[in-house]
Amino acid sequence: SPFPVRNTPNMHINTVRVDYRATDEQMLAWVKRIDEIIGARQFKKGIIFTVSYARARFLAHNSTYSGQMYQHTSRNIAQVVEQFKKAKPPAVLVSPSVTTGYDFPEKECEYIVVGKIPYPDSRGALIKARQREDSNHTAQLAMEVLVQEAGRGTRSATDRCQVFVVDDTWKWWWPKHSELAPSWFRDRI
């Protein structure tokens, strides 16, 4: 990316490991951490990537800031994204799926929360076969989505967008797989 590194800092914030083993108590701690990020940015608009619709609903149901959240289903993505884009701050788009194909320039998105490292569902036969051929296959797919997520709010050299990762999977995943990221992305960590 030709954009200045300082305009898009990416950082991990200790929270909880977000995976199928996470307890309700841990997920409530995850919501609390996201609420802290939202609460400190009440004059801005942001996006929270949740990977799943179930996690998006859990967040919206338990967040102090649920009234500021724009949630969509697989059927009304474009409509809800448009409502969010037109909204005045504070506003938060909670989505598992606007990782590509959507731009949120300037004031449309000034912070992003990566709620979970975006690993693909690895239970299918095809992805299992590809993973057997290349042990980094799912990590590469996750990295590609993460890079796309982090870039939704930085669309020009003058854009500024903070990116927060609140999944403690990051602690082992980034050191192990950082070489899969483009160098310009690594420079922002």
Describe every region a protein language model picked out.
Residues 12-51:
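Conserved interdomain hinge at the start of the Helicase C-terminal
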Residues 46-78:
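Conserved helicase motor "Helicase C" RecA-like lobe of SF1/SF2 P-loop NTPases
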